[in-house]
Amino acid sequence: MENLENQSTSEQEAIKSETERANGSNQVAFSSEELKPSPRDITQRNVVIKKIKFYTGPNYYLDRAAMVFNINFSPLVKEFDFQTLCQSIFKKLPKLKNSKPKDLPDLFSLALLEILRMDIDLFIHKFYISVDNEEYTIAIEYLDELVAEDATYLVADWFDALINPKVPFNFDGKFKRIQEDFDKSDFGGPTIYSLIEAGLKRNIPVNFLPIEGQFQWGYGKKSIRGRSTVLDVDGIKDTEFTTFKDSCKEFLLACGFPTPQGATVYDEETAEEEALRLGFPVVLKPVAGHKGQGVTTGIMTAEQVRYAYQAIMLHHQTTGSEFQGVIVEQMVFGKDHRLLAVGGKFAAALEREPAYVIGDGVHNIKQLVKIENDTNEDRSNNSRAPLAKIVIDDDVKNFLKLQSKDLKTVPLDGEKVYLRRVANISAGGLSKNVTDIIHPKNVKMVEDIASFFRVTAFAIDVLAEDISKPWDAGNFGIIEINAGPGIFMHLAPAVGKPIDVPGMLMQHFYPSVESARIPIIIGNNLSLNFCNQLQKKVKEINPKMKFFGSLTEEGISFNGSFFTKHPKHDWNVAIMLRHIGLDFAVMSHNRDVIHDFGIYHSGTDIVILDKPNYAERSLESEMLPHGYVVEIYNDKGIIEVLDAKKSLATYSLDSNNKEASLLKAISPYLPAIIERYENAPRNS
């Protein structure tokens, strides 16, 4: 056995599309047939995968979510030179070069773990190997079920192809497909994954809620839920208000914040009239937009106004999005910046520059784009890359035309040619961290505006000639405000140090591990009668603990009243810990549910073991550092309480009233446990 630890409306639309993908399922729908075993008879396969099972949380094998499967290697694999196989694997997965696998299942697990981490180094680390008769059982940490299953078959087919060159196998193509499928999964969005990882790194419980299509951090009354940075604790009306660009503009102007003058129009003629009233240059943009789509800047003539208006209408027709009007506003000159607040406090500032190429006097613009995409290692179609690939589309061609250029133009040596009007990072724009140089007055402006909204993550897009100068010095204008903005860009700027905004957001809610948790007691044979007695004791210790949840063989009970019993044990645990009023939780996990479902939650303050079998004994691994194990010895007539290091006390066991004896044994430790969590509230 081995156990190894090795954005604006645009933002809202992005969140909406992400949520629609997730609706009703924790898996992305895609065809993965090409990744599954080939149609050859299974008896002819050299690496056979069987009995794949997924646990959504801690289980008998691992202290976290795990995919478990049996694997069998044919004699041909066993007889193949092991070192040759290792070197072939390491060639494709160079991060494994310094690993020292001791046998085939170890090598398979290491390769699979590296595939599951992908090129983006996902935060997964553990696997466990055991022997099951002639087969091996491998348990490995995972995020998305379909991606993990397909990755397992990928590695099995890969091993098969490495020892049998006649078997065709395109590793690079299949690995790329795995990564693309992960990007489409519920875990794959850069912002949501960064928040998941930020929680896990801080030992904050993180679980996916498949029915809701969102994630939960923390338990019970300490929990928050959401997708991307749109969270249940945010004000729904405030979040909605930020999607109305025209109303936001009026509000900011009323408050005296620097916002360009403008108006919302609903036809081409009025747009032209408003532009003439404001004076050129002007900007046209849709009231409801996405990632700069439909935005036209630097408009200098009435003809260009009509063209920009028609482009917006065409965009709505093409995408099927609802037309809510067009904003015509004064043009503000300056560099594009994203200013971010977390919990009302300034967090980060990013300067964004539109995609461009630098001329060499030899190549034309189309060739320069290809050279930039091919040679700049920071550019990738991976959504987590600091720079996206530059894509040539109609927007690029039209903007070049305004500059009296086209794709065949050969720029002068050293000439900088911008390809887009808008500094869109996902379209090849460049991001630069300017958090350290922003003027204090601009920081105060961010916090002043954020203070009007009950929104945790709040972004302000501004144009400023120099962000290190105060906003009232001129050349500064607020373009729009955003609730639920993307925050991954701050973790991976193209220039400058990263700012851990996901970590800031987690720290805002959970300054300590205890602020994410509630008291939890688990056991292998807890009765409803014991839970009801415990509830009375807890309320006696702290009358504020008003909502008590228990899970026994009878099902879920809240405050002693039966609530429901789901056929799946892990769903029962999830339902109970999902309750936003839950103060205290007690759960019974016996051998059958541990094998079939795992226990879902992580960490416990007290583990109560009553004649445990080998599976139930695994509950001890969930004991928190300050926790206790309570052993009931029926044959000796005693109850022993232990911490992580030693025995603390023994109590006599009344066989006729076991529940009362058990409650007496744990009662001395309950006040400190309750106080630990009650003194660490979650921030709002």
Model regions and ranges:
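ATP-dependent carboxylate-amine ligase catalytic core
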Residues: Q535-N683
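ATP-dependent carboxylate activation and anion-phosphoryl transfer catalytic cores
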Residues: E2-A198, K345-A347, E353-D360, N364, ...
